[in-house]
């Protein structure tokens, strides 16, 4: 047998941990008890219930009462009286800007609502750390959403029934066709629903007996399932941190 070496074995260099992908799902005006995992006996939300069961479920929150302040707080980690809510200045640093500095590619799909609902270029998503943006800069109070792709106005839609699916399709398209597979990603998907004026597809209205709010909640759950299935199909599920929350509860 060979003699044991008098020298200690070389220390293996530790591999750098793989950076996780990050998916943030953010709904609008959704109530605490709207999901099965938070007590709803009426709304069927199997996808989000499974997410809660497999992950960490938080049950006590402090939230802002309205959209803009909640969103600026989420984006910056700062109290709304500092980050200014709907009037969030270009000088605020978002989590997207921080993540870009450490190699992330960044995308925002859906409702922005921190640029006073106006196309102010230096306060829109592309200027606040997001490489890609598709969505509405404000709310759908009038039953319409004005849509931008990056900084470009692409049109106005009054199809509130199709908005959740549209945003999900854009998020899926980003994952499948646009992201760089060699980099970790941040995808911030901020749905307009369940903010009034609400609507859902004919399929979910029929499924819920024309209970419109239930239809909106259940369609969101279904569309979330499509998105999570896409992560799994692409082999990304095990290395993606999924965070789901709502902005402020029912309005």
What spans do the regions from the language model cover?
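Formylglycine-dependent sulfatase
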Residues: 1-251
